[in-house]
């Protein structure tokens, strides 16, 4: 390309044949390409090393940004789980309200209404069939919600063969009465267990005596353990997993509260001998108080060792 005034070339052009065959052009471009490739490889190694150090050591500005990004991801995941839990709770509340309304309607029925099925057996059989289908759907949904609840609380059996605390909930050991003083996070573990039992009662549509966790129970661990135990035994009895009059000392001595909670989540049946009275709060509280006080006395005599 030449200038229209001075007729001097303003841009140097090469044809394709000369570019591909001229030693001067090929050598220069190949050297430049080789140098660029080496620089790209070196920069890629630097970026990879910097990211690995930032992720592993979490030092420097980039490490802090990576750590913050991970925290934001976990926070978003927890927020999604919390939103899902609130939706499930609202759904269960609506089902409970509908159940209570149907129960009140059944109680308000007059004796004359009971004669209607005999007058129209076909309609009665149809209603019975619909009721059976509805009960099956409610039972299936309830079981599904309970399984999701177990996954949300991450209730697992430990693989470390720990004889004292073989189970964990939300990544901390599940406390028990027998080794209460050996666990430094017993209060936090019990709080998670109480929350789980309350949500489980709503998912399984079971009325429990203590439906809320009071703040004063955080200082009175004997009452807190007793409340949790009564609620847990109530669910097991209502779900036909435990007889109505179990012997409380034999039951807790055999399974303890962590074993009973694991059987509730895993679906196993609870074996126990028959007691003289139902597991009331008074009976459970007396056993828990005696067991924990005996543990305190054993600790004072030096028979127990507190693990830091």
Swiss-Prot record:
Any one GO CC term of this protein is: phagophore assembly site membrane
Q: Where in or outside the cell? A: Preautophagosomal structure membrane; Vacuole membrane
Q: What is this protein called?
A: Autophagy-related protein 14
Q: Organism's domain of life?
A: Eukaryota
UniProtKB keywords: Autophagy, Coiled coil, Membrane, Protein transport, Transport, Vacuole
| Recorded domain comment | Coiled-Coils at the N-terminal half are essential for autophagy.
Species this chain originates from: Eremothecium gossypii (strain ATCC 10895 / CBS 109.51 / FGSC 9923 / NRRL Y-1056)
Swiss-Prot/TrEMBL GO biological process terms: macroautophagy; protein transport
Function of the protein: Required for cytoplasm to vacuole transport (Cvt) and autophagy as a part of the autophagy-specific VPS34 PI3-kinase complex I. This complex is essential to recruit the ATG8-phosphatidylinositol conjugate and the ATG12-ATG5 conjugate to the pre-autophagosomal structure. ATG14 mediates the specific binding of the VPS34 PI3-kinase complex I to the preautophagosomal structure (PAS).
Q: Which residues form a coiled coil?
A: 73-109
Q: What is the lineage of its organism?
A: Eukaryota, Fungi, Dikarya, Ascomycota, Saccharomycotina
